[in-house]
A protein has these predicted regions:
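Divalent-cation
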Residues: 1-155
């Protein structure tokens, strides 16, 4: 099962692992690699529709986990007539984290996770120094990925 690992940009630098579907993983990977399909895929279409209707994605927020399922929100703002985006979202739409991330990487929107969610489900990232053996670090990470399950992150 594919997994997205979100990392805190500063501070403790915890990881938030989220299991996602293969189609969504492919959509995220395609966008991150800068690959453009000959015709728009679902998340490309969503990005186009936002622009056509004068809205932009201000940010996404991974908000909570319930019964081993993560939830997210799209924070949309209407583009002002002068082209500036407002600070507060005009619309907040609930969605799957994988769809939110796939859309965010397409439009360059920031990705956030609720602090209490990271406190609850986040995993401490290993501290890597120049002295650490890269092979050992990779083996530990592979072991983590191969053995992780949704129950590991449930409250």
């Amino acid at each position: 099962t594919p997994m997205v690992l979100l990392r805190e940009p500063e501070g403790r630098r915890r990881l938030l692992p989220i299991l996602i579907g293969t189609a969504e993983a492919t959509a995220i990977h395609t966008s991150l690699e800068g690959l453009e399909p000959p015709r728009p895929l679902t998340h490309d279409l969503m990005a186009i529709l936002l622009g056509e209707f004068g809205a932009s994605l201000a940010r996404i927020v991974i908000t909570e986990v319930r019964d081993h399922t993560f939830y997210a929100e799209l924070h949309l703002v209407a583009t002002d007539t002068d082209g500036a985006d407002g600070d507060e979202p005009d619309h907040v739409i609930s969605c799957r984290p994988s769809d939110a991330i796939a859309l965010a990487v397409r439009v360059g929107a920031p990705i956030f996770a609720a602090e209490d969610l990271v406190d609850e489900c986040g995993q401490e990232a290993a501290v890597v120094s120049d002295d650490d053996d890269a092979e050992e670090i990779i083996d530990e990470f592979r072991d983590f990925i191969e053995n992780v399950s949704p129950e590991d992150f449930a409250p």
